[in-house]
Amino acid sequence: MKYVVSLFLSVLMFSARAQVKVSGKITDTKGKPLYGVSITLKDTYDGATTDSSGNFSFETTEKGKHVLEASIIGYRPFEQELTVAKDPISLNISIKELVTELKAVVISAGSFVASDKNKGAVLSALDIVTTPSANADVTSAFKTLPGTQQVGESEGLFVRGGSATESKIYMDGNLVNNFFYSSTPGIATRGRFNPFLFKGTIFSSGGYSALYGQALSSALILESNDLPERTQADLGVSVIGIGGGIQHLSKDKKSSWGVSYNYANLWLGFAINKQKQDFFQIPVYHQGDANFRIRTKSGGMIKYYGYISANKTGFRSADIDSTVLKNAFSIENLNIYQNINWRENFGMGWKLTTGLSYSTNKDDISNELQDANNQKQVIINPSFFAFKNFKLRNNAQYAQARFVLDKKLNGLNVVRFGSDYFYSKEKSTYTLFDGSRFAETVTDNLFSVFTEADVFITNNLAAKIGGRVEHSQVVDKWNIAPRVSVAYKFKDNSQASFAYGLFYQNPERKYLPTVASIDYSRAAHYILQYQKMTNARTFRVEAFYKKYTDLYKTSVSPTGREAATNNNGFGHAQGLELFFRDKKTFKNVDYWISYSYLDTKRDYLDYPTSIMPSFAANHTAAFVVKKFVTKWKTGFNMSYNFATGRPYYYFKYDNAQSKYVIGDAGKTINYNSMSFSVNYLPNLGKTNKKTFLVWVLGINNVLGQNQVFNYNYNNAGTKKEAVTPPSKRFVFIGCFLSFGIDRTQDAINNNL
């Protein structure tokens, strides 16, 4: 017995001597102690957990080389090789926070996101179609956000002192030419595409990604839907027309196809809303589209979208140079657009996105000088009357091929690179009053390569760094455009962002061809943003400065054609923008407020000096409020848009100085417009609904406030006429049905 006790004590003493203490402290990269970190010697049972001070301690009988592991959710796993001998081991360990999508800062300087799933979303997809002043038009909805101008006489997005041609629109990465219906004098046309085609929208008012180019001011980036939730059909009837479509999802939910057709005839709409123009051809539109989508075995997606539209309109308006003559303008348009894309994951962090697009656009435009009996008049003297009789035929073809390769690195870090090739051929035939014809063709081959990296240093600090190189046949020169954005997130989850970039653009088609040697126009963007977002509120303030160089100057030929002559133009735009959205303060009420201050001047085209352009206002603001009353099954939406007066000018040629000078100038009245809409959902609350029905009533400019967009001058500059909307207000009534899918909850959530 004595021997056994002695042996037992010897073993205890040996074990005590053989144990080695391992201790230390674990902190994050900022020195903050981490509680609950699990520490173990790999492939053993020895280990411990840190206390509230980050300290740990354990003993081990292991000897030799081992790997110490430390792990905690939200941080990168830590490993360190150490040698266990006789002496205690003391360690001070610092581990890095794991960069995750839910916690990471969002690089957002210059951009607004509209998506139901994106955590940085400011507007959802349904917001776009329920904003009263937008009339279910994608671009019009973004006019309630800061940075955009309230230009009512011309289509397009006028952003931060830039013209509409300085904003480009992309669908699934490919540039969309003729996104809007063809222009008509003094009337802004709307976009061609249904907003429900898109699952995501990014509106960048500056500093946009190196993946896109040829836009001096902004980019609107649209991403089309993938597979539908289920098979469904839609039907709509309104005062402007009728339309319907179907989306069919396969039984295995791996593919779908869809078609739609819309017919618009504004006879009834114009009967309700009297127009100031005398329409001899009521606007008529035929529009059809088709799509298919296929999910690949590896989870990728192939998407095709095809669109065709044909439309025509014609109207008479008083001629400003005469008290008895009229101008009869007419236009017929045929537009075809096709886009196919393939997105695929190849494993090992590689992703490929490719796209092909092809489109054609044909415009037949005619203008006649007519008398009181609507008979054509050809007046040779004075000569400017003669040029009011003309015909113009435009034929354009566009094609684009594009690919982007993404390589995912550790965490959220990604590097991407790619290239695109863009082909355009635009032919114009101009026929004068005497039958003389002038035909011009402009062909361009634009090639670009680009690269961009998302670098997440921590969850709180990230950068997007990239660049783009382009070569255009028209300019016959290369350009290099660096882009960089940096964002930092504070402890209260607010964040600050900075963006810088160079942006280049070719001259507009209407100023080509030219015999002059020309270069790209260029703009440098500097953007500083502060933003705080919660589930219920969004606040952001953004300051920007934009410097224009090498803007095009133009001159007019004896036939009245304006062409680019040099790149001596320049300009600047600077300002401050505010945005606030609140879904919390008032029960069941969602509202947002935006404000923009803009200081801009430029010398370009035929401007005689550096002046504020006629499409810019110093102050713009918008207020949108929405409330859904479940008891009444009704949603109420109101928007108010405001802008201070815009400048207008009359340029006349001074023979003594051999240049244009300002003959007259002024400012329009302030722009005010309140719009209202009501959505009634009669099926709300019913069970086993197979049909989702919405009645819509919308009124633009409810109060009938006077609006003046600009002024037109007669040839001598002695008379001017205000450019005003076609009607004081517009009343829209429609009924929309969806068969096979219930969107009631979407409609409710959108208004809560």
Question: What residues fall within each predicted segment?
Answer:
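C-terminal beta-signal and adjacent terminal beta-strands/loops
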Residues: 585, 589, 642-654, 680-752
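Transmembrane beta-barrel wall of Gram-negative outer-membrane proteins
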Residues: 240-263, 277-312, 330-356, 409-415, ...
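Periplasmic N-terminal accessory/gating domains of Gram-negative outer-membrane beta-barrel systems
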Residues: 76, 112-167, 171-208, 219, ...
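Gram-negative outer-membrane beta-barrel transporters
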Residues: 457-458, 567-652, 749
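Flexible loop and strand-edge segments within Gram-negative outer membrane beta-barrel domains
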Residues: 266-267, 281, 299-352, 360-397, ...
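Short, acidic, small-residue-rich periplasmic hinge/interaction motif at the N-terminus
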Residues: 27-32, 37-42, 71-75, 85-131, ...
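Membrane-embedded beta-barrel scaffold of Gram-negative outer-membrane proteins
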Residues: 353-357, 361-365, 489, 497, ...
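Short loop/turn motifs that connect adjacent beta-strands in outer-membrane beta-barrel proteins
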Residues: 99, 150, 211-212, 227-232, ...
